[in-house]
A protein has these predicted regions:
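Short hydrophobic alpha-helices and adjacent helix-cap/hinge residues
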Residues: 1-129
Length: 129
């Protein structure tokens, strides 16, 4: 998908391929802006979906697993503070996310006729009802 105009065609290809599920990576800002439309279309196709950002689950997507972006933004703010106070950028370590969350939308699971196994529910950071 190159942009928002390609969303419908991309989902039509997924439907024609008779996909069993859909995984949407968190690296495309255009998809984040289209999340309401994307989730509605995916659910209309009755495709279980896994997203990289919680906001998709809050809009009705089935599940998300990914970093907590609020933590990432806080860390970026700390870097900016250090840089504006004169820290040499070469002295700052490269950091990776350390907190990840699994969020499950139980309403969507029920609508899709899916039962989420108890061990998966126990590992969830949050559920949407």
């Amino acid at each position: 998908m190159r942009g928002p105009a390609d969303l419908d065609a991309a989902l039509e290809r997924v439907a024609r391929a008779q996909a069993d599920a859909l995984f949407v990576l968190p690296d495309d800002p255009a998809l984040h802006n289209l999340r309401v439309r994307l989730v509605a279309r995916v659910n209309a196709l009755r495709l279980p979906s896994l997203f990289g950002m919680r906001e998709f689950v809050d809009e009705g997507g089935l599940m998300s697993y990914g970093e907590r972006f609020a933590d990432t933004y806080r860390q970026a703010a700390l870097y900016v503070t250090k840089l504006t106070r004169g820290t040499n950028p070469a002295e700052l370590p490269i950091e990776q996310p350390t907190h990840f969350e699994l969020v499950i939308n139980l309403r969507t699971a029920a609508a899709l006729g899916l039962t989420i196994p108890r061990p998966v529910l126990l590992r969830a950071s949050a559920t949407v009802r």
